[in-house]
Amino acid sequence: MLQEKELVKQKAKELLLDLLSIYTPSKSEANATKFFEKISKDLNLKLEILPDSNSFILGEGDILLASHVDTVYGYIEPKIENELIYGRGAVDAKGPLISMIIATWLLNEKGIKVRVSGLADEESTSIGAKELIAKNYNFKYIIVGEPSNATDIVVEYRGSIQLDIMCEGTPEHSSSAKNNLIVDISKKIIEVYKQPENYDKPSIVPTIIRAGESYNVTPAKLYLHLDIRYAINNKREDLIKEITDKFPECNLKIVDETPPVKVSINNPVVKSLARALLKQNIKPRLVKKAGTSDMNILQRITTNIATYGPGNSMLEHTTQEKISLDEIYIGVKTYMLAIEELWQKI
């Protein structure tokens, strides 16, 4: 057991430092092509590259371990200190991805066929997950790899609506203006704003506002973007109507939308992950997340799906991303034990 653990940790250190050294913000995933070509050869895993999104799939089989290769912007030089690995994506989600790759490799060596994907664009519009849907990929079971503290199993995510609002007004000289588009729309923003408070209450948050071209002229046009988050029990249509009614003089356009997801705690993937953790004397916790992930998209392939991964989720998108080799080992072991159980059901 000790020998296996040290093998996994050494391989994780090697692969994760290599992958962290490659800067892959959303839409730049092709930068990792040589990395995936090399590990495909070294680990004897068939490689498929999805052409529309530059997503990577390794291995074969009806079970998918799905993580993502893209990160948020801002490169962080990778380093290792006392078995802690630092770098952009160490937590979200190259650490979970490397855990999944190693698990896939070890399972493949045992004759258990499973696929692992480094999907593209999860941090933006999930074009990698959407390409799997568009091309009718079929999997019986899916585990999504996102940081969940190596103990938590995510069974629910909120949905999101990304809404552009374009408004027009009459430009006037600022010294004598009777109307001001910025002031008028600002009042409406305050009225429609819903601060993120708890999971079950929807949030409506302005994230971008642009208006005006001259110091002394009130704007003729104003652009506003709202980021809307809602749980599965909230009514999407009511949220859209509330905003539409508040901005009747403006043009509204949904530029991206991700549905909420909630899966049964009795589905086979959730159960297998829970048992895998218990076998390691780790108490599993079922949780719901306020954000979104590729699980929201991939639920269209199968409802036998859940999210789990190593890494402290509080460090996502921060400049302090770090993950321990022990966490990665727990992730590898959990994926392997869960899939060995699921494999028996196919």
Swiss-Prot record:
The keyword Metal-binding applies. Pfam families: M20_dimer, Peptidase_M20. CDD domains: M20_ArgE_LysK. It is found in: Cytoplasm. Pathway: Amino-acid biosynthesis; L-lysine biosynthesis via AAA pathway; L-lysine from L-alpha-aminoadipate (Thermus route): step 5/5; Amino-acid biosynthesis; L-arginine biosynthesis. Zn(2+) 1 binds at residues 68, 92, 146. GO terms for biological process: arginine biosynthetic process via ornithine; L-arginine biosynthetic process; lysine biosynthetic process via aminoadipic acid. One of its GO terms (cellular component) is cytoplasm. Binds 2 Zn(2+) or Co(2+) ions per subunit. It catalyses: [amino-group carrier protein]-C-terminal-gamma-(L-lysyl)-L-glutamate + H2O = [amino-group carrier protein]-C-terminal-L-glutamate + L-lysine; [amino-group carrier protein]-C-terminal-gamma-(L-ornithyl)-L-glutamate + H2O = [amino-group carrier protein]-C-terminal-L-glutamate + L-ornithine. It is an enzyme of class 3 (hydrolase). The active site is at 70, 122 (proton acceptor). Its cofactor is Zn(2+); Co(2+). PROSITE patterns: ARGE_DAPE_CPG2_1. Zn(2+) 2 binds at residues 92, 123, 317. Its EC number is 3.5.1.130, 3.5.1.132. Keywords: Amino-acid biosynthesis, Arginine biosynthesis, Cobalt, Cytoplasm, Hydrolase, Lysine biosynthesis, Metal-binding, Zinc. One of its GO terms (molecular function) is hydrolase activity, acting on carbon-nitrogen (but not peptide) bonds, in linear amides. Belongs to the peptidase M20A family. LysK subfamily. NCBIfam families: dapE-lys-deAc, PRK00466.1. Catalyzes the release of L-lysine from [LysW]-gamma-L-lysine and the release of L-ornithine from [LysW]-L-ornithine. This is [LysW]-lysine/[LysW]-ornithine hydrolase. It comes from Saccharolobus solfataricus (strain ATCC 35092 / DSM 1617 / JCM 11322 / P2).
